[in-house]
Amino acid sequence: MKNQWKHAFSVILSIVVLVYCAALILGREVSAAGEGKITGTVKLDGTAPHMKGIDMSKDPYCVKAHASDPAHLEQVIVGANGGLQNVVLYISDGLTGSALTEVPAAEPVFDQKNCVYTPHVLALDVNQKFKVTTSDQTAHNIHPNPNPMTGNIPWNQSQPPGAPPIEKSWKAPEFIEVKCNIHPWMHGWHVVVKGGPYATTDGSGNYTINNVPPGNYTVTAWQEVYGTQTQKVTVAAGKPGTADFTFKAK
C-alpha cells in the first residue's frame, strides 16, 4: 500500500509539473502574440537648414578619411521625402511594472569612426551598459557633459588607437551632449530614457517601437534642434498604434 501511495504521489506531482510548464509556455506565447508596436514617420515642414562642411585640417588623418566623402554637420538630416533622421521616439507615459524596470541586455556601441561619432544619436535605457569604441588610427577624447543634478556624472576620457572599449551606463533620463576635446567638430548625443522600448528614425524618418504591450501611451519625439513633441497612442493586441510627427523648420 505504501508503495502504491508513493507511485500515486509521483504521478500527481508529474502532472502538476507538466501543467505548470505548459501554463508558462502558453503564457509566453500569449504574451508574445499580444505584444504590439508603434510605427510612424517624422518629417520636417519647411526648408531644411544647410549643414555646413566640416574643416578637419587640424588632423591630417581625419582629412584623409574624408578625402572622397566630405563630412558635414549632422544636427538636421532630412531625406528626399522630408523625413527626419536621428529622431528618438520613446514611451514617456503609460508603461507599468517590469516594462519600466527591466534593463535591456544588449550593449549599444558608440563608435568613433572617421573622426565622427557613429551613431550621431545613441538611444539607451537608464542603467543600460554601453560601449564607446574607436575605429580610428588617431587619438580621441570622449567627453559627455550631463547635468550632475540629474545624478549623471560627467566624464572625460582619452581613447588612443587600439584602445579597449570604454564601458559605461547612465543613472537617470537625460539628453546628454557628447564632444571630443581633441576634435572640436565631433559632436553627438546620448538620449537616456526611463524604461520601456524606444526607437530612432532612419534616413527616411521612419521608426518602429517594438514589444509594446496593449494599452494607452504617450509617445515623445525628440530632435536635437527642434526639441520634443508628444502624442497619445493606443496599442491593441495584434493591432499596431501609429504616431506621425512633424517639426517646423526654423
Positions of predicted regions on the chain:
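N-terminal secretory signal peptides that target proteins for export/translocation
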Residues: 1-8
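Bacterial N-terminal signal peptides
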Residues: 11-24
